[in-house]
UniProtKB/Swiss-Prot annotation:
Species: Maridesulfovibrio salexigens (strain ATCC 14822 / DSM 2638 / NCIMB 8403 / VKM B-1763) (Desulfovibrio salexigens)
Protein name: Large ribosomal subunit protein bL9
GO terms assigned for molecular function: rRNA binding; structural constituent of ribosome
Residue segments, region Disordered: 151-177
Family that this chain belongs to: Belongs to the bacterial ribosomal protein bL9 family.
Keywords from the UniProt entry: Ribonucleoprotein, Ribosomal protein, RNA-binding, rRNA-binding
GO terms for cellular component: ribonucleoprotein complex; ribosome
Record keyword RNA-binding present: yes
NCBIfam families from the UniProt entry: L9
GO aspect biological process, one term: translation
Function: Binds to the 23S rRNA.
Length: 177
C-alpha cells in the first residue's frame, strides 16, 4: 500500500514522503492516526495544498521542543531512594521514576522519550538524555540520593549545647532564690 506521510514517523519517513507499507499497518494505524493518507492523484494535489500548513505546524513543534530543552537544561531532578549496605540501591531508578519526578516539576515528558540504556542502580549524578522531538534532544541533570540525604551531626550538637547550659543556669538561679 502506497501512502503519503502527513507527519514524521520514526523508522518510516518524514513529512511528504511517499512510502510503501503493509496494508494492515496503513489502514489500521497510519491513516486513522492522521499520520498518512493514500497516495492517489487527488490526494497528491490535496497534500500539496496542505503541505505548507503541516510544515508550519512541524516547525512550531520543533520550536516548542527547543524551548523545553533550554528549560530542562537548567533543572536538577533529585530522586531519593532507599539504600542498603555499601550505598547499594533497593531496586533501581528507571525512566518511569524520572518522568514522575519531572511531572512533579510541571514538565510533561513521556517515559518513552527518556533515553536510558540501563536502569540506574547506584547513587550519584547523571546526565539523562531526553528525545523531545525527532530533531531535538535535551539533557536533564539527575541526582540519585539517599532518603533523608546526608546527615550532619555537628549542627545538632551545637543546638543541644545551649539548651543544656540554659537548664544549668535555670537550676543555679532556682537554688540561689
Amino acid at each position: 500500500m502506497k501512502l503519503i506521510l502527513r507527519a514524521d514517523v520514526d523508522a518510516l519517513g518524514s513529512l511528504g514522503d511517499i512510502v510503501t507499507v503493509k496494508a494492515g499497518y496503513g489502514r489500521n494505524y497510519l491513516i486513522p492516526q492522521g499520520l498518512a493518507m493514500p497516495a492517489s492523484e487527488a490526494n497528491l494535489k490535496q497534500f500539496e495544498l496542505e503541505k505548507r500548513k503541516l510544515q508550519e505546524m512541524a516547525d512550531n513543534l520543533r520550536t516548542q521542543a527547543e524551548g523545553l530543552r533550554d528549560k530542562l537544561a537548567e533543572v536538577e531532578v533529585k530522586i531519593e531512594v532507599r539504600v542498603g549496605e555499601g550505598d547499594k540501591l533497593y531496586g533501581s531508578v528507571t525512566a518511569v521514576n524520572i518522568a514522575d519526578a519531572l511531572a512533579e516539576m510541571d514538565f510533561d515528558i513521556d517515559r518513552r522519550k527518556i533515553l536510558l540504556s540501563d536502569p540506574i542502580r547506584s547513587l550519584g549524578e547523571y546526565d539523562i538524555e531526553i528525545k523531545l522531538h525527532p530533531e531535538v534532544r535535551g539533557e536533564v541533570k539527575l541526582v540519585v540520593a539517599k532518603v533523608g540525604g546526608p546527615v550532619e551531626e555537628e549542627p545538632a550538637e551545637e543546638v543541644e549545647a545551649p539548651a543544656e547550659t540554659e537548664v544549668a543556669e535555670d537550676a543555679e538561679e532556682a537554688t540561689e532564690a
